[in-house]
Amino acid sequence: MALIFANGHSDVPSTQPPIGKQKKEIGRESVNYHPSVWGDRFAILTAHEIEVDEITKQRAEKLKHDVLKMLHNVSVSLQDLNLIDEIQRLGVGYHFETEIENAMKRIYNSRDNDDDDLHAVALRFRLLRQHGYNVSSDVFKKFKDEKGEFKASLRENVRGLLSFYEAAYLGTADDTILDQAIDFTTDQLKSVLPNLNPPLSELVKLALDVPLHKRIERLQSRYFISIYQEEKERNEVLLEFAKLDFNVLQSLHKEELSQLSRWWKDNDFARKLPFIRDRLVECYFWILGVYYEPRYSRGRMMTTKVISLTSIMDDTYDVYGKLDELELLTTAIERWEWAAMDELPDYMKLHFSALLTAVENFEEELSKEGKAYRISYFKNAYTKLAKAYLEEARWASADYVPTLEEYMKHAQVSSAYPVLTLSSLLGMGATATKEAFEWAINMPNAINAISVVCRLKDDITSAELEQQRVHVATAVECYIKENGTTYEETCKLFKQKVDSAWKEINKEWMDPLQVPREIIKRAVNFARVIEFLYRYKDMYTESAGETKECIAMVLVDRFVD
């Protein structure tokens, strides 16, 4: 039961049956996954549906230079802080990374903490922490009264409250004032929301749903462009550039998805493996959340293939495969040889063949750049994942319920996030050095914390289908059996553990790193995707509703004049 592909939603029983002495027969389960909500839509896209005209591209390039001029003139004023924030939230910050980083250095070195404007202080704090500067949260002490409570006057400052709310989610374990800020601002924003008007009300609703720090960047940009165009004090040049750039970038994303959809269709996975979830488009959207910028195009193509093949593997281990067959598949993956396919049942051969072909193609391309060593790291990580899946299948067969400690130690691998994080480095450029792969394979604190977020977010929204078939116990069930708690008590505790894991992620982001932030950001972005997809149910498996709407916003709908 891998984290990234859990199934459905239900309450977990408040008690766990005793560990069975007899092995259960696993495999050949019947799970009614809905078919792809996209069909062949992206596989048959025409050039007209994908391409953006040259006039649009030229206009976007001209506007880009206009925005660049604005950045050359930035100082440390609130107006300039707002400009940088708007550029990033509108999704065009990737064009100006050097200029923004230079501006953030100036802002940090200015040490200007004297402002009594809550919005200004919170915005400065958030931007600096987003860029890795470990500025002190003591700057917010000035907003408390003599009783140690946040001043009552702050309740009237909705923009300030919203900025403070967003900033508070970049806290670490040492930032107790930010924990207090989350409680205070959440209560106040919920209280005033019914009395607000757009666009401010839309910003508040968006933030209360998922805070900015935990949002998928591309989806956040799509929302923010629509909200920003209603702002009275909007920057028209910046707004037009953001819309055009969104359309230009969407064109590239459509082309990538079209190629991947044809690969998926040519392999005929959905028809030949009817027990799997047909979710190629959702997989691409997932990886678009990890990196959307043009320079990561190859990385998206490679990682989407990996995650979609991992989804097939997960359904094989979790739903369809019998234990003796899963033993054979695990051995075949350990060998990484075509000859190993002879030992597999016919239905496993398609997946195994596609996996070997994909990895061989990756290796051939990377060899031309002297980067073939990356594949050995991938094979190592993927083999560990297969072994972890097999161990969970054995647990399910034996009706074994581990302790939470044993479960979580195992889940660091079976969550699939270590292998997916490493996979996201395969197609990257020079930043993904051998040292970066060593960092990823050795499970650093950042990846451990992200695995906790992903594992527990999944298990809190544990699936109804999990309860309808033989399955490995979830973290919730493990804890309930071990401690005799209720479902509600356990979920509350796990949400606290998720919050603590995010604080560790934030700490790792700001502390001196073994690898560049460009590398660690891939791992952090995986956690952001999970925060979105597992807010209240498994929106990967059940992708016909909100998931489809969000994918359409990013990959179908263009901005028009």
UniProtKB/Swiss-Prot annotation:
Cofactor: Mg(2+)
Record InterPro entries: Isoprenoid_synthase_dom_sf, Terpene_cyclase-like_1_C, Terpene_cyclase_plant_C1, Terpene_synth_N, Terpene_synth_N_sf, Terpene_synthase-like, Terpene_synthase_metal-bd, Terpenoid_cyclase/PrenylTrfase
Organism encoding this protein: Cananga odorata (Ylang-ylang tree)
Stored Gene3D superfamilies: Farnesyl Diphosphate Synthase, Terpene synthase, N-terminal domain
Protein known as: Sesquiterpene synthase TPS2
GO molecular function annotation: magnesium ion binding; terpene synthase activity
Protein encoded by which gene: TPS2
Location of this chain's protein in the cell: Cytoplasm
SUPFAM superfamilies: Terpenoid cyclases/Protein prenyltransferases, Terpenoid synthases
Binding site for Mg(2+) 1: 314, 318
Enzyme Commission numbers on file: 4.2.3.127, 4.2.3.128, 4.2.3.-
Reaction equation(s) it catalyzes: (2E,6E)-farnesyl diphosphate = beta-ylangene + diphosphate; (2E,6E)-farnesyl diphosphate = beta-copaene + diphosphate; (2E,6E)-farnesyl diphosphate = beta-cubebene + diphosphate
Biological-process GO terms, alphabetical: diterpenoid biosynthetic process
Motif DDXXD motif, chain ranges: 314-318
Quaternary structure note: Monomer.
Domain remark text: The Asp-Asp-Xaa-Xaa-Asp/Glu (DDXXD/E) motif is important for the catalytic activity, presumably through binding to Mg(2+).
Cofactor annotation remark: Binds 3 Mg(2+) ions per subunit.
Keywords attached to this entry: Cytoplasm, Lyase, Magnesium, Metal-binding
Entries under PANTHER family matching the protein: ALPHA-HUMULENE_(-)-(E)-BETA-CARYOPHYLLENE SYNTHASE (PTHR31225:SF93), OS04G0344100 PROTEIN-RELATED (PTHR31225)
Function: Sesquiterpene synthase involved in the biosynthesis of volatile organic compounds. Mediates the conversion of (2E,6E)-farnesyl diphosphate (FPP) into beta-ylangene, beta-copaene and beta-cubebene. Does not use (2E)-geranyl diphosphate (GPP) as substrate.
Signal peptide boundaries: none
Keyword Lyase: yes
Family affiliation: Belongs to the terpene synthase family. Tpsa subfamily.
Pathway per the UniProt entry: Secondary metabolite biosynthesis; terpenoid biosynthesis
